[in-house]
């Protein structure tokens, strides 16, 4: 697969970004050829105990489980939800009987730690 095809099959939209003295928080929605993934990313700031470890809290829906739900509908829902976004998104999916996977992952920057 060449670069042009990959770009056509991948989409990413920023939903929100928030920063305080502890960390920077990023909220994104990504579309892959076979799934849609909502990510809440937390990046602790320098001087914080978890500095150098990025946390990704993800909800993944395989395309075959979307039923009639579209990427654009999910994006609109997430952009209009301000607090407890992940929890409300999971409730939204459960009410529509949409199968999803939710997991917390992390990445360690060995150059920092």
Where are the model-predicted features located?
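Amphipathic, interaction-prone secondary-structure segments
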Residues: 5-40
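Intrinsically disordered, low-complexity regions of eukaryotic proteins
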Residues: 5, 42, 56-59
């Amino acid at each position: 697969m060449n670069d042009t095809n990959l770009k056509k099959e991948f989409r990413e939209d920023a939903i929100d970004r928030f920063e305080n003295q502890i960390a920077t928080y990023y909220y994104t929605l990504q579309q892959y050829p076979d799934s849609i993934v909502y990510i809440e990313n937390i990046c602790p700031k320098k001087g914080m105990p978890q500095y150098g470890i990025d946390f990704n809290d993800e909800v993944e829906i395989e395309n075959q489980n979307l039923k009639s739900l579209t990427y654009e509908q999910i994006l609109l829902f997430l952009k209009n939800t301000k607090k407890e976004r992940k929890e409300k998104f999971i409730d939204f999916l459960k009410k529509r009987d949409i199968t999803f996977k939710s997991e917390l992952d992390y990445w360690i920057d060995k150059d920092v730690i």
